[in-house]
């Protein structure tokens, strides 16, 4: 499948995978890509498959000459689902912001190298993290 930008989807998936353990290929559809980061374990006592994590997820959509994004912070529960919830612990918020900024920078640099821009979605109003200089 070729995206509106003219780049084959399979090539983009390969490049996105090289950015790190962020892309969830099974949740990517058509011209949309899904990334997430399980940044902070809520409680290490349960078995690994039963643990919950604080983290973020990002949806990326291919446009003609750019990709648009929206992201959320929240809880990745033991069933493997994301829920947007407020996070009260300062250290956790700082870790999430750091990992999101790091990923955003890598993603932006990759897209620029391909002649594409990275911009917030028109319907993405909430920007709690300063992602670009």
From Swiss-Prot:
Top-level taxon of origin: Bacteria
Gene3D superfamilies reported for this sequence: Sigma factor-binding protein Crl monomer
Predominant location category: cytoplasm
Region entry Essential for activity, spans: 99-122
Subcellular location: Cytoplasm
GO biological process: positive regulation of DNA-templated transcription
Keywords: Activator, Cytoplasm, Transcription, Transcription regulation
Function of the protein: Binds to the sigma-S subunit of RNA polymerase, activating expression of sigma-S-regulated genes. Stimulates RNA polymerase holoenzyme formation and may bind to several other sigma factors, such as sigma-70 and sigma-32.
Stored NCBIfam families: PRK10984.1 (NF008217)
Family affiliation: Belongs to the Crl family.
Name of the featured protein: Sigma factor-binding protein Crl
Organism: Salmonella arizonae (strain ATCC BAA-731 / CDC346-86 / RSK2980)
Gene this protein is translated from: crl
